[in-house]
């Protein structure tokens, strides 16, 4: 009979097969009350599942990450229960867990409304209050088919067809409602009280726009009401920081239907874009990169040689001219290999670092487009390093240091790094993978920061490191990457002459720091809520007069600021100074300069910040020095 070993090393013996819940009850009623599921021999199981042999057991509660995931998954089933009670004609599809929540895809003869969502949420609360047990039944395949046939759940039947090897499946019963899942799920609805439905959107069966359209109901769920309230507060703050709203309020950019996924940059937004580009250009020049420019449209044969045509054609914009097929480039790498291939290269020439602010276009699904965060036309701070196998380690180490320095300049101190290693299907021999993976791991260790290993998550052509930023709301944004490529140099005939006077393929390192300018600017807007550090602010100073008699002096101050490289404007409107200050504060301009008769007479300016702090009266030269110091500190400088 089973001996159960607990995480602290304690053991419990039973003279009969025992469920996870029974083990929890034997430890104490408090633990049993909070038992969501169990981890038996490192495998998640339901609380009702029996343990028949000697095993290790961890009791899973809502405090555990796995417990929270199970709660969210069970909430998705609860959505199904409520929907079927309110809308019997609905057909249930799938309801997975996503980051911080869940969703359920549903077929309905009409779109759900916000009133429908409110009704579904209310019904879910009533079902939770019934405090019913969720019953699991392992069911033979034929019986599963009969259950869903009798209920008219055609999508569930299609999912069963996708699993021909499964002889029995888990059916989870929420009273009269039944759903199919591998589980585990909560044993009782009492664990589901801290939830909220968040939005409705469209989806497609199997994610394919050619298939029938579905409705997707999103929700979030947490271990307790306090966590839920904190999440809702964070989401409300995120909505206030939505880059689309701020972009409109600050006149940065707009999107329109005639050019879906393409950005119309306004003067203010384009200023931020140019500051980023000029900054990255200098960073790359200072670190040994050669800036190049390659064509936007390239003959389709190059994409066939590179392999993109076979694997990426659905995301490529194509065109035809004079009996030739072309593609608008979705990425820059094949073009950079063409530049490398011009002229014979020696091992003495390596590494060669080619950088481009590459304008790319990808035919992303219209439903996935999101402001400037997810677009069809974008510019990458793209570069490719061509090096020998022995140079991988140093190049990666240098890139990691450079990337972390750049992120600090933008005010991001928390950076997550992940190393993705060889998948089962791959090109290149194991010795090359061993060398590349060790080089990347050693470079990460040398950086002195924590990093995460993702076994098997690398691309088929090489391992990679991903860099993710954490913003002020705790959200994580994957931005930078460095990717070893053993494949493209071979496909596109890139080679160099070795020290032994033989030909060999270089290793190609794909790398980007910001990712795309558009998305990175969107991240900055939301991180700073539009209150950009002075070096990124489209307008750094606004000079305002109190009466018309100071207008000429105000323009002279603006001219001097511009002569010294500051981005400055004047506000000479015949309005009260308080009104002008309030209006320019809403525009998030870092410094507001006021000139009255006294300032004109003394040749000074009165300076206040956008937060309302009065910095007092100072000379124009002193103010210029102040701004230049702030700009030099970049994202490390906070305007009080």
UniProtKB/Swiss-Prot annotation:
Positions of Zn(2+) binding: 333, 384, 510
Localization per record: Cytoplasm
This protein's UniProt keywords: Aminoacyl-tRNA synthetase, ATP-binding, Cytoplasm, Ligase, Metal-binding, Nucleotide-binding, Protein biosynthesis, RNA-binding, tRNA-binding, Zinc
GO cellular component: cytosol
Entry EC no(s): 6.1.1.3
Region annotation Catalytic: where it falls in the sequence: 242-533
Cited InterPro entries: aa-tRNA-synt_IIb, aa-tRNA-synth_II, aa-tRNA-synth_II/BPL/LPL, Anticodon-bd, Anticodon-bd_dom_sf, Beta-grasp_dom_sf, TGS, TGS-like
Summary of the function given for this chain in its UniProt record: Catalyzes the attachment of threonine to tRNA(Thr) in a two-step reaction: L-threonine is first activated by ATP to form Thr-AMP and then transferred to the acceptor end of tRNA(Thr). Also edits incorrectly charged L-seryl-tRNA(Thr).
Subunit composition and interactions: Homodimer.
Protein's recorded name: Threonine--tRNA ligase
